[in-house]
Amino acid sequence: MEGYIGNKNFVDMEAMRYWQFPLNYKKDKKQETYDLIFSGRYVGALKRDGYYQRVIKDDDGNIFMVARDKNVKGEPVDKHEWVPQLRNWFESLPNGTCLIGEIYLPNDEGSRKITSLLGCLKEKCIARQQEQNKFLHFYVFDVCAWKGENYMSKPIEDRIRVLNKINNSIYGNYPYVDFATYYEGAELWDKISEYLAKGLEGVVITRKDCPIYEKRTPARMTIKIKKELSNTIDCFFTGRASAPTKAYTGKQVEEWMYWEDARTGEKFNERLWKKYDEGTTSLMPITKNYYYGWAGSLE
């Protein structure tokens, strides 16, 4: 049947919607985001300022490119013929494929520009791209199915491995198609700073055990970090940070969890007050930022 891979209709499925901090969120978004990124439990990739699309090549070889939202009749709208520059890539994909991505214009990003183009009649959309010499690109950032195997219940770590294999094969060697690169930890933090400093849309971070949900994901399984957060995540824009203070001088030292052996440099994440108080070791309490190698202050 059209749109089906195995027993699932990937054309008519509900798109995954990514969680982001509510506007009235009371806690410190910057610190929470920082803590999550350095927890070792998240990966993240660039978010293009484009328009969500799923590319499907079903079990019978039928090709579709459908958006997140459906038309007024509640039907998915196929737009794959609006981007003939992607035709060779579409046709090369194996049957049983569903890739998630964004249609975007390089160096001229903006979702409104994309909806304006794809909202035209097919011939007009193609003509406008040719006249302006600006051709829509497809940015792949996730995989629902590949060669008939359904990956929706697999964690993002597994899906990234599949994406990398696709990207490193002939399917990643087509013009107008590019694949997301995922980062984690300090490298992800630096990339967020770099992307937002360049005026790009932002980043989506995803917990490593996150499958593909239909509709909205649970809180903090995915988090959109966008340029609109510049007032609260200001460090993403400068990328500058001072070195962290080493010695902890707070009042909770008896319960403190971050310590270093001043002689060997070995760090410990446990309560060591009693040993410290005995005065027979070279232990010293250190700040949480120093323990994790985080910035002392963010500019």
Where are these regions (language model features)?
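Nucleic-acid 5′ end/cap handling module spanning
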Residues: E2-V11, M16-K70, W146, N164-E299
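Covalent nucleotidyltransferase
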Residues: Y34-Y171
